[in-house]
Amino acid sequence: DTWPSRPVKIVVPFAPGGTTDILARAVAPELSKAFGQQFIVDNRAGAGGNIGAELVAKAPNDGYTLLMGTVGTHGINRALYKSLPFDPIKDFVPITLVAAVPNVMEMNAEKAKQLGIANVQDFVKYLKANPNKLNMASSGSGTSIHLAGELFKSMTGTQMTHVPYKGSGPALLDMVAGNADVMFDNLPSSMQQIKGGKLVALAVTSSQRSAALPDVPTVEEAGGPALKGYEASSWFGLLAPAGTSPEIVNRIQQAVAKSLGTPEVKEKMQAQGAIPSGN
């Protein structure tokens, strides 16, 4: 049969509302338009992205199950877990990069105000005086969000209590509710809450400022000598099970590249703080 003759599933290995989910939902309708078949986002959260990634690694290589992979599922987890239920290189064929994304160091706005924290240096000062007083939410152990926070702790010699969630979506709900204090989230998932004033962005984790938040400094810029050289950013891309036909891979790659080039998708992504990067 000519691919696609039925709906195609894009597995997101995290809960709804996070950046992986936002990017998959930006690309899916464009692929549906390009191929005249539905591309459906399927959230399979857990184990820092490993559950969803394993599902795709073991799926038939017929082009009907794709993965929105991340620097976590295909980079970090290999170093973090003793054994993975899949091989991030051998079990997949990369289709295309979708976006590069800075993380943002953010606090619950009320909490920051209450503690008199207006910038990165205030934050470090508070932590030095109150070790482990603040809790640090993440999208799961070993995700880029978790490691961006750990890097910050190790460079500044500070301590926070790590609270892992099953994705940014649930972590953000607790951040907004004031149950979690600080997070180094991927910028797109937090953008709305920052713009709405629920969260305050102290810094971005990339080496340069983000065009989406031009007034927010980088961690390195705001943090003084202890944070010189600090940088943490993430990538997101589409992958298929190993052995998927090169023809299908090429067709998807071209359709994604075309959609990322359209002003509509480009602007949507950039407004969220993602940098579209089809290759």
Description of each model-found segment:
Residues 70-71, 109, 187-188, 206, ...:
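Short secondary-structure boundary segments
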Residues 230-231:
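HAMP domain helices
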